[in-house]
Amino acid sequence: MSAGEPGFETFIRSAQKPFQALPFLSSGAASAIDCGDRGIAISCASHSGSTTHAREAFKLLWQSDLDVGLLQCPVPPGSESALQYNCSGKHAAFLATSRKMSWPLETYLQADHPLQQEVNRRIAELLGLPPDELVASR
C-alpha cells in the first residue's frame, strides 16, 4: 500500500541528522569520549548557535583531541566561530568518528570519504534501498 507519490525524490536535510549520527554511536566514538546525552543530542540537532550549544559542540571536539579549525561548516554572519553554526554538533561528531576510525579528518565531508559512505549505507539500509539510489550519493 502506498499513498501520494512514493517515487518522488526529496531532500530531508536536517531531519537526517539523527541518521547521520549513527556512525558516531556505532563506531564507539561517542562512548570513547563519554559524551553523554547532551553530546548525543548536539550531534543530532540543528541548534541556534547559543553559547550552550557551541560549548557542547566544542566539548565533542575537545574530548576527541580535535581542533575547532577542522570544522568545515561556515561561521554564521554576525558570529565569531563555526561552533555557532547550526550544524556544528553534527560536524564535531563527524570529526570525532573519523578520529576514532583513523579516517582522514580534512576530507570528512567529501562524498567518497569513508564516513560519508557509512552514513549513506546506514540510511539506505534503513530505507531498504541500494545506497546508489540515494539522491545525496549521486
Stretches with model-predicted labels:
Residues 31-33:
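Conserved catalytic cysteine-centered active-site region
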Residues 35-138:
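Active-site-adjacent helix/loop patches that line small-molecule binding or acyl-intermediate pockets
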Residues 12-29:
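Active-site SXXK
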Residues 5-13:
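Alpha-helix N-cap/helix-initiation motif
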Residues 1-3:
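A short, well-structured edge-of-sheet supersecondary motif
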Residues 7, 24-28, 46-48:
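Short glycine-rich, polar/acidic loop-and-turn segments at beta strand-coil junctions
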